[in-house]
Every structure is written in C-alpha cells, then in structure tokens.
Amino acid sequence: MAIFSNQATLTYNGGTTNSNIVYGELLEVLTATKTAVEGSYTPGDRLTYVVTLRNTGTTALTNLTVTDDLGGYPFGTGTVYPLTYVTDSAQVFVGGVPQAAPAVTAGPPLVITGINVPAGGDTVIVYQALVNIFAPPAAESTIVNTVTITGGGLASSITATETVPVDNAPALTITKAMSPAQVVDNQQITYTFLIQNTGNTPVVATDNAVITDTFDPILSNLVVTFDGTAWTQGV
C-alpha cells in the first residue's frame, strides 16, 4: 500500500499560514499468492510453483514484471541460490485460458515480464525449479523464496513467499560385489554389500531394513559378517 499526504497554504494580507497535513492510503487492487505443488524437497527434485495474481480493480493491469529470488541466501561474501529455473517451464493462464509463453530471464533471479491481469480477474503463472547443490540437506532445513511483482502502474511492489521443507528421511542405496569373479567347484566366494545413506536421518532398528539375497544354485557353509563382526547364520 502507499501513503500520500497533502497540506494547503492560505495567503492573505501579505501573510501566509499552512493547514494541517492530511494523510490518505492508496489501496492496492492487486494481490499475489505463491504455492509449491510439492510438500517437501530432496536434492535433485523439481519443484512446481504456482503464482496467482488477482486484480480486484476496474482497470486491467498490463506489462507487469514477476521476479523470483530463487531462494537466494547469504553464503560467505556472496549469495547462493538453491533453485535453478527449468528452461521453458513457465506457463501463463488468464482466467484459466493458456496464454503465449512469457518472456523469461532465467537468472538468478528469475524474471518473467509482460504479464497482464484483467480487471476483476486473475492470472496464474506456473513454472518449475530444480533443487540444486546449494539446497540445505540437513534435517529441518527449508527453501524460502519470494516473488516480487512490479510495474503496470502499481503504486508499490507486491510480494508473495513460499516455504518448502526438506524431506526428513533416510535414502539408502546398496551395491553388491563378488570376489573372485570366476570360480571352480567348491571354491569360496565373498559377496560384499555396501549400503550408503544419503538422507538426512539415520536408519534405526524400527525401520526394519532387511537384505534379501537369493542364491541359485544354493550355497553352503555361509558366514556373514557386518563391519568385521560375525552375524548369526539363518539358512
């Protein structure tokens, strides 16, 4: 919103006197909201953002600029951006009707220009961003990013912010190796499993992580160790 003021001056008989100052508030007719379709993120995900612009006035708003900060935050002496705009993903809908692809500068920041909002109507902008290596992976982390709408005769800029939390969960991968690769009858084989957790929370006993390995032909005299410690054999 914008505040304006006014003061009158009265001149008479060679003298001057000023009135009191009156203040008014210019109400903005444009509102903006921003939401993410996905409820959480992990590194490498694509997030879909929906920006809705609603014009409650009686005059169309034209040639607006929408700027997304792509979640930039201070790091060292500069700024890093955890989101990367996905090329050609931006779409615009006016009253639910698809429009021509908007002019986009990928940034950062992401800048979308030439946006129009009809009188008494709404415009929806949809675009995607890739969660990159600068997205904080630690548990309870978030990506907070803001869009700012300017131009089109607006008295002041309009902003809308969305916060997406990290997915607090383990992420396991397993790799299997065999040594030696070539064997003869009755020769011992060593199978090695490497399990890695790239998530942000540990795997605990209640997660019931189980390795199942089916041998064909069936092997005998099995010995299982975990980090050098023998495990109970169950065959």
Predicted features and spans:
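Exported/extracytosolic protein signature
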Residues: 1-235
